[in-house]
Design a protein with these regions (language model features):
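Nucleotide-sugar donor-binding and catalytic loop/hinge architecture
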Residues: 1-5, 149-162
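Donor-binding and catalytic core of enzymes assembling or modifying cell-surface/extracellular glycoconjugates
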Residues: 172, 176-261
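Surface-exposed amphipathic alpha-helices with a cationic face
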Residues: 22-32, 184-185, 232
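Conserved nucleotide-sugar phosphate-binding/catalytic loop shared by glycosyltransferases and other
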Residues: 35-66, 277-284
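Nucleotide-sugar donor-binding patch of glycosyltransferase catalytic domains
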Residues: 101-107, 214-218, 249-320
């Protein structure tokens, strides 16, 4: 009888990047006889704690003990989907045969600086290359995010409403207050605003100046799982380039995403949703301003601020009609 494999996946951060690993994890679990373990940071545990395709999760909260714990597992393979100094050190310490995702540094440089796109595919497809040695095939079932249905949130999620993630790692990745306000003013459905603590005041100002009085500010008030639950039950999800976009993609709900300094051409757009998805780009060029969106070559505050509110509204109506 053939021995069951034991495979360790590594991805430390962040929300979207971890969610984007889930098709590879699922396909490995279903296509080979293997125990699947996953190493990530403690603060991202909730993203995968309910994932039925992962047998054990290790959390990188104590580096003094994690190496000995992993050594005891006796892994056959390591699939490194982060490929940074820390993950490379772990591979060195464990001395296990490993396969790492390519960071495509040259290709990213050519795209950002010269508009030459040699990436030409989604990052999920790049992740799948790490398991070619196991003859793993993409089942094309998209992303996985398992959220418990019993989450209790003080909101009537059974009614029709829109969810809108107004956050972003950098100001240059966020729509402005007035852009959002101008859209919300003309939307008849209730709207929930989602983001972290940093956007609380941002959301409050939108509510203060908007004519639409059916807006709920959940910024900084919900866990990732609770936010995911609201997104899952909404009729449409609007978002900047955020990790929550990938969670929404796993639920196969309609998505409108907004792109400024980053661009879908980098390969991190919503992956394989079965419902409608519209990527709205500020500059009709496939050349990103920067890798993570911290710098804009067109406007100090970010070229995302040039996306017309009336076009956003048109796309909302297009999806909902």
């Amino acid at each position: 009888m053939q021995k069951q494999l034991k495979i360790l996946f590594i991805r430390f951060s962040s929300i979207g990047d971890i969610i984007l690993t889930t098709p590879i994890v699922r396909c490995v679990k279903l296509q080979v006889d293997a125990q699947v373990h996953f190493l990530t940071k403690k603060k991202y545990n909730s993203l995968i704690e309910n994932n039925k395709y992962i047998d054990k999760i290790y959390l990188l909260d104590n580096t003094k003990t994690i190496y000995s714990q992993l050594e005891k597992e006796g892994y056959d393979y390591i699939i490194d989907l982060h490929n940074n100094l820390r993950s490379n050190y772990i591979k060195f310490k464990l001395s296990v045969k490993s396969f790492s995702v390519s960071k495509n540094i040259l290709e990213r440089y050519l795209l950002i600086n010269f508009g030459i796109n040699r990436l030409n595919n989604h990052v999920v497809n790049r992740y799948f290359k790490t398991v070619n040695f196991l003859n793993i095939k993409n089942d094309n079932l998209g992303l996985d995010y398992f959220v418990k249905e019993e989450k209790k949130i003080n909101y009537d999620y059974k009614k029709d409403y829109l969810s809108w993630c107004i956050g972003g790692t950098y100001e240059q990745k966020k729509l402005s207050i007035n852009q959002i306000k101008d859209v919300i003013d003309k939307v008849d459905l209730p709207i929930v605003l989602l983001a972290g603590d940093n956007e609380k005041a941002y959301a409050n100002e939108i509510i203060r100046i908007s004519k639409n009085k059916n807006i709920t500010n959940f910024c900084g008030k919900l866990s990732i799982n609770e936010s995911a639950y609201l997104i899952k039950h909404s009729k449409l999800f609007l978002t900047n380039d955020t990790g929550m976009m990938h969670i929404a993609s796993s639920f196969n709900i309609p998505i409108i995403s907004f792109w400024g300094c980053t661009k879908p051409s980098l390969g991190f757009y919503a992956y394989q949703p079965k419902k409608s998805i519209i990527n709205m780009e500020s500059i009709k060029s496939k050349r990103p301003c920067s890798r993570h969106g911290s710098n804009c070559r067109y406007k100090k505050e970010g070229c995302i601020k040039t996306i017309p509110s009336n076009e956003i509204l048109e796309n909302i109506n297009l999806i909902l009609d």
